[in-house]
Amino acid sequence: MYAIYKQKKYDAELRLGKDVTLYSYMKDEGFENYVDPLGRESDDFFSKKMDIHELDYLYEVKYEFLYRGHYFKALSTMIRKLIDKDYFEIAAGIEKYDLIEKLGFKRLDESTWWKDIRRKDIEAIKIIEEPEGIFKEQGLKIKILEGKAIDDFLASVKD
């Protein structure tokens, strides 16, 4: 989850629908040294607790990959390590059973199937920005990347 606070993007966590914690590797104004659940204090990672109403925006990002003419949820996370290994996973539910059987998906659990694919198999990436909390009414923002834009996006991903 991400938050925009004072026009800057942060990793964020939402609790109880209103309590937000921002995370940063920079000690921005009002941020304190992060303390993990075991009580260890970090010198290079910081956090700031706040009410959701103090934010400019709060959202979750989800991805879908266009594979053989159909969009599927990205099951693998968008992290550098997996991108460098050219490893992507897609998932589908029972509603697409005939299609996933034909495309060689494997059963993950009772209602979900998955398949690992490579970059060359991805025809497009749909980036879905879903507002959270009090920002939900703003609606989804969807961006579709194709061709070189996919490669540029994947090259820009950091951990």
Task: Give the label of every model feature segment.
Residues 1-159:
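Short, surface-exposed polybasic-aromatic patches that bind anionic ligands, especially phosphate groups
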